[in-house]
Curated annotation (Swiss-Prot):
The keyword Cytoplasm applies. Keywords: ATP-binding, Cytoplasm, Glycolysis, Kinase, Nucleotide-binding, Transferase. This is Phosphoglycerate kinase. ATP binds at residues 336, 362-365. GO terms for biological process: gluconeogenesis; glycolytic process. It comes from Sulfurisphaera tokodaii (strain DSM 16993 / JCM 10545 / NBRC 100140 / 7). It is found in: Cytoplasm. It is an enzyme of class 2 (transferase). Monomer. It catalyses: (2R)-3-phosphoglycerate + ATP = (2R)-3-phospho-glyceroyl phosphate + ADP. The lineage of its organism: Archaea, Thermoproteota, Thermoprotei, Sulfolobales, Sulfolobaceae.
Length: 415
């Protein structure tokens, strides 16, 4: 059992899941090459192998469901290739079934032997899966009514889609004993540290270009007094600098205007006035019109801001070393250009070398991890969350977690 944000999330150990028939919801949604239709990255598929292997080792019959893309998009493809890759990582055959709720799929599920697994076709070929609704409503869909009677347990291991309220994510927990899979368990355990008052000081490193989303996170952290320091970078830092009255120069103001961010200045100013522990860069790496790079102080910027500066890196790194929990989301600079990755990589390095527990989220931030860095799972958590992580940090409810909690309440009679 894991407790997070007043929710009790059941895990596999809370039930006797041995030699049973299990419906496992995973998230193996992967980037697709538009020309060939082949998968470009299989990291999500690889990550789910642990839960599947464990369930098979316990002689369970495992029925796997997942999605890939959305109807009408180039990445809306079959899961047939996924099943082959999944088989490779699990070390056993995961048979692909070209059906979801039809007679063929139901027959395959009924005849599935112990220690065997099948992967059903892309669950989003079922139109109901595209509709978001409350768990009570989703529990009455054809998807749930057709598959639930065929299994004993439901396990959700799809944290990356925990912010969706679709039938495969929230419908089954209301009609079957349900638990979090290993990925879901790790994500929830790591994120619970963020709001655990005993794990302080808490340092947040927030950057990137999704400024409105990041402001929402900061507002929630400030309102609930979660953060001890919020270290800003990227466009988020520029917005706070302007809100503070710092003149970043006409070119940078033009960048903010072109991205429609000037309207957010009053909101950023309100956050500053609330006493939120916001740290703003004291210098920046800028690119001058000539193409020359310069390290300029915040109040004398001579070009377009591309990264945080050297002094800021030193100051931020010292703050990070003090943290008991360090959460990083969003890069400090324009990391698409190798010249402007120093700030992001330096803070990642400081975090990994710090004595604190580190949570790294967001695809851009994760991509900046050096390939040779050894990730100690007891100290560093690399989140697969994406949108789910964003909403969790912003204080929004995650329907999939809410549904697992509801299932526990219904099964145990406890709240």
């Amino acid at each position: 059992m894991i407790k997070v944000a007043d929710l009790n999330i059941p895990v596999i150990e809370d039930f006797d899941i041995n030699g049973r028939k299990v419906l496992l919801r995973i998230d193996i949604n992967s980037p697709v090459d538009r020309k060939t239709g082949k998968l470009l990255d299989d990291s999500r598929i690889k990550a789910h192998a642990e839960t599947i292997r464990e369930l098979l080792d316990k002689q369970n019959s495992v029925v796997i469901i997942s999605h890939q893309g959305r109807p009408g998009d180039d990445d809306f493809i079959s899961l047939e290739e996924h099943s082959k890759i999944l088989s490779k990582y699990v070390g056993r055959e995961i048979e692909f079934v070209d059906d979801v709720i039809g007679p063929y799929a139901r027959e395959k599920i009924s005849k599935l032997g112990k220690g065997e697994a099948i992967l059903l076709e892309n669950v989003r070929i079922v139109s109901e899966e595209l509709i978001e609704a409350p768990p009570q409503q989703q529990s009455k869909t054809f998807l749930v009514r057709k598959l639930a009677p065929l299994v004993d347990f439901y396990i959700n291991d799809a944290f990356a889609t925990a912010h969706r309220s679709q039938p495969s994510l929230v419908g089954f927990p209301l009609v079957k004993p349900s638990a979090a899979g290993r990925i879901m368990e790790k994500e929830v355990s790591a994120l619970s540290k963020i709001f655990n008052k005993e794990d302080s000081p808490k340092i947040f490193v927030l950057g990137g270009s999704k400024v409105s989303d990041t402001l929402k996170i900061i507002e929630h952290l400030a309102k609930n007094r979660v953060a001890d320091r919020i270290l800003t970078g990227g466009l988020v830092a520029e917005l706070f600098a302007v809100a503070k009255g710092i003149n970043l120069g006409k070119p940078n103001m033009q960048v903010l205007e072109n991205k429609g961010l000037l309207s957010l200045i009053p909101r950023a100013r309100k956050i500053l006035l609330s006493g939120a522990p916001i740290e703003i860069p004291v210098d920046f790496t800028v690119e001058k019109p000539s193409g020359e790079l310069s390290n300029d102080p915040e109040n004398n910027v001579s070009g377009i801001i591309k990264d945080i500066g050297n002094t800021t890196i030193e100051i931020y790194s010292s703050f990070i070393k003090e943290g008991k929990v360090i959460t990083l989301r969003g890069p400090m600079g324009v990391i698409e250009d190798e010249r402007f990755r120093i700030g992001t990589k330096s803070l990642l390095k400081a975090s990994i070398e710090s004595p604190g527990y580190v949570i790294i989220g967001g695809g851009h931030m994760i991509s900046m991890l050096d390939k040779d860095v050894e990730i100690n799972p007891n100290k560093i958590h690399v989140s697969t969350g994406g949108g789910a992580l964003l909403l969790f940090l912003a204080g929004d409810k995650l329907p999939a977690l809410e549904a697992l909690h509801m299932s526990w309440v219904m099964q145990s009679g406890k709240s």
